Amino acid sequence: MQFKVLAVAVLASLPLVAAAQSSVTVYGVMDAAIAKEDTGAPGGSRTVTNSGNQSSSRLGFKGSEDLGNGLKAIFNIEAGVALDTGATDSALFGRRAVVGLSGAFGNVTIGREYTPIADVAKETDVLGQGFYGSNLSAFTSGRLTRRISNSVNYKSNSLSGFRFGGAYATGETSTGPSLNLMGVMVDYTLGGLYLGAGYHTFERLATGDDKELIIGAGYKFGPFEVKGNYMEADPVGANNQFKQYNLGGAYTVDAHKFFANFQTNKLENGAKGNAFTLAYQYSLSKRTNVYTSYASLRNNANGVFGLNSAGTNVTPPATAPGSDPMALSLGIRHTF
């Protein structure tokens, strides 16, 4: 009888053991704001309700399964959400969709993933790739590549402060521009110091290679932090080279956080635009904050650069070079 009772107890516990070896987490960001935006061109002023002025609104699922001996299976799918309309991105899980393995060797994933350059850009933007005038504008304008589909990706664990990463993505075509991406990154962290660099090349079958580059740094000391980066895109063709410089700082005291960032954009054809951003965040709790931001951009006679936040784009039309965009927002962000 004792044996039967013990056997029943062991069998009853098996599902609990299996459940303990795997986990799934639901997470997200809900960010909405009222904004006054002006492209600087005639008729370009508007008042809007935006989703994602500080951080892109999203809903994600991530999980892992313990396979034993330090090896885990991992996955992550993440969808963009527009709180102003309730719509999702054109690709449901277009923000991230990967599956892979994690262990002492690092992480290997397959699917739609952030690029090596995007990892460094995120770490070296004091605005957190949110707010108008962040370095996100280099990606949302299509000049640099933030995410890549059909990719195989590797990221090492920290090795005495160093991390290494690489990605290869197939264009999935045998004729015409293939756009196979090969990318690498390396970064170093020591206390409050961060240094990083990344490089991409897009292999085209006929016309040559597009190239992208980032070098960035950051330092946090007490309530202060300073971050900056240099990004470059050199696509095939004449007068197409793009350069962006960012330098910003932030100061945190109690529930208050203040941001300032300066950005310069340049094209090889002589177009230039300088952007300046001021932002303020007040934390109501660990997961909820309200914020306000102001940004302005001054284009030269050839410039049509814009102010891009995580959720919107304030860019003059190509027919109105020299226009000066401006944006002001007031919003709330909740994370879970």
Residues covered by each model-derived region:
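Gram-negative bacterial Sec-dependent N-terminal signal peptides
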Residues: M1-Q21
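Outer-membrane beta-barrel architecture
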Residues: A9, G60-K62, V98-G100, N153-K155, ...
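Outer membrane beta-barrel
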Residues: Q21-K36, R46-G171, S178-N180, D187-G191, ...
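Outer-envelope beta-barrel architecture signal
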Residues: S22-V26, E65, N69-A73, A104-V108, ...
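Transmembrane beta-strands of outer-membrane beta-barrel proteins
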Residues: Y27-A33, N76-E78, G111-E113, G165-A169, ...
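Transmembrane beta-barrel outer-membrane domains
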Residues: N50-Q54, S90-G94, R143-R147, T175-L181, ...
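Detector for outer-membrane/organellar transmembrane beta-barrel domains
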Residues: L181-Y282, A295-S296
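Outer-membrane beta-barrel "beta-signal"
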Residues: G322-F336
